[in-house]
């Protein structure tokens, strides 16, 4: 068997063993995709014992390409919501998550100085303790840029593997200790979250109001500031027994019933101006009006604003809602359309069909991956990651690297959505497949490289002390911030658990947090809010630590 064929076969074996280990769960918690690392260590140990030679250049390429795939697909997935998460609504969550990252870096620095831990080892312990694989890749790359020998850099993978198991367990233990310490009732926390999120930014509501303000009589809808804003959409108007789709120039009359869509606080303000809410139904059933969901797939409308389509004037159709990446938004006239957006249309069937044809509504296109934008994004990301940032007094230039560059570029492209006929939408199933493939390849190689000396390090070397250092790096930041967030900020427990999981970019911890309450989405929401920024910081932190430690030594 050729060296290349042998290398591929061994990697496949690592993936099989590792994924099997990851699927083993104890009390509902397992290593998940992290099991591939341990599969690599096991196979790597026996490969080393047997004296089998694998292709080092090929392993190195597979490791780096796997990392690029992983971080790029993460960026594309969370890009649409990343910049929104940095606004005021997620500021508090992100500040606490940043504090966890900073404390982790400080604990790592203190341990490095107190116990004189070798730089590659302490960076590996840090990456494993915070369960962040891209941090491992970023740390290895900066060490190579600093001229550290390859065999020394590979120690990072070994120390990462030592610290990784408690990294996962430590998050779960912190959630449990916070719950125990504050005597938290999860059911009540879920109820409080639902009550508070009634005014949340992510939920759209509808109300039917009667026009009671005499100043609005015979006024065109477009002249009513409340109804001509980007915060509320008036999708139906009922006058007597007639239900119609209102156009901007439609004159409203006293006694008209309006069906409004928007955020609760905006609807409340509209109610104060227009009139009281009524229980009368404005359902389209039994009328010639229909409500349908249409998907934007036509390349010709990508990037256009809703107002530029003129669907009200041309087709007598109203766009009442816009669903983007699972988040419902008000279909404001200034919103730009992106591939995969789902629009709620209200109008007559023939008019809706005409608008749907203009928007595309080709469901099969949602399952197709446009590969050209994928490789454009990866290429631009690698270029961005290769740009050196020279800081006076530092021995090496700081770079985003192969972990940070593609991630930042994917976040930007995911937010932009489309440029001309190129769109960066990726079907969730395709995104997940590429992401899983990337992380499996990366962890398989890291495990293989670490496996040869792993057992000896654990039984005869400093393996146990590395595990202890990892426990400190995991536990101190999580417990400190967990207690502060609950005690001082009075943060909802389920939201807190999601934030802790997101601050460690740890899907198994999110799964555990979600299982605390079956129907509450609090944990998932806070996880998604902090994840993008934390992922970026986790990639940058080991590079900063490496450059600082190297300069001081």
UniProtKB/Swiss-Prot annotation:
Gene Ontology biological process terms in this record: potassium ion transport
Family: Belongs to the AAE transporter (TC 2.A.81) family. YidE subfamily.
GO CC annotation, single: plasma membrane
Record membrane topology: Multi-pass membrane protein
Localization (cell): Cell membrane
InterPro entries: AAE_transporter, RCK_C, RCK_C_sf, Transpt_YidE_put, YidE_YbjL
Keyword Hydrolase found: no
Keywords from the named record: Cell membrane, Membrane, Repeat, Transmembrane, Transmembrane helix, Transport
Designated name of the protein: Putative transport protein KPK_0013
Biological source species: Klebsiella pneumoniae (strain 342)
Gene3D superfamilies, per the entry: Regulator of K+ conductance, C-terminal domain
Organism superkingdom: Bacteria
